[in-house]
Amino acid sequence: DLRYDRADEFVEIVLGHWDSWQDDALIVDKSTNLFADPSKVSRLDHKGKYFSSRGPFTVPRSEQGHPVLIQAGQSGRGQRFAAQWAELVFVGYPNLEFGTKAYASLKAQAVEIGRDPGSMRIAHLIAPVVAATKAEAEDKRAELEKLPIEEDSLMLLSEALNFDFASKPMDEALSDEDLASMSGLQTFRDNVIAGSGKSNPSIRDFVEITQRGRLSRPVVGGPKEVADYMEEYFTTPACDGFVIAATYVPGTYEDFVKFVVPELQRRGLFHNDYEGKTLRENLGVR
């Protein structure tokens, strides 16, 4: 919770700096040597619990007002932080039922805070394995599942949780002290404890449940199957859009554009052109 308490204050300061320039503050008049209207540039003098910061910011406001605030974190405190500040929330749902409830909950939390739920977009992570046909995609998946090695999983888990997963035997139960020392993506730890049904899961439990370094919950199929999956999540709704994870490089994004995008466009679910010049415009974030 301390990390998020600090983050709350940090974001408040950053937004204060970005908003210290009004949209029409710039004059840029060489004849008068006037760069900006001083009445439209305000001073920030923040002295808080964790940070002190003084403004105004040293650069003018950007064309999109300020960069889009993107957040990832699905713990209870992380969701409250997202509801308060995030304009794009990065999520990874295990299934549609969970996603539908989580989506509604996060939007409701934003409303409770006084935000327009349309000012926050939620993007669900998918790992597509796509080909011209479902059979070809299944063959591709079979080949991909031969590739992971145990050392990669341990390395990625160690990175995510700041714990040396190579320091213990794979099937030895981790101690309470081991589990308490894990930091970083603590949702991983909590999900493993819940998913394994053990208060002291083993390292193998972490590998099997988190699927780090492996093909985790892939969406496998031809254009129709992958588009069906995305359409169901989008229209239920369980998300406002998607983050496409690369399951193989090179090739994932090329195959997705070749096979899936035309099908989504045919269904009227994906744009044929861009909404504007900025990320904010293209996300539809107000």
Where are these regions (language model features)?
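C-terminal amphipathic alpha-helical "assembly" element
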Residues: 1-15, 19, 57-286
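Active-site region of glycoside hydrolase catalytic domains
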Residues: 1-56
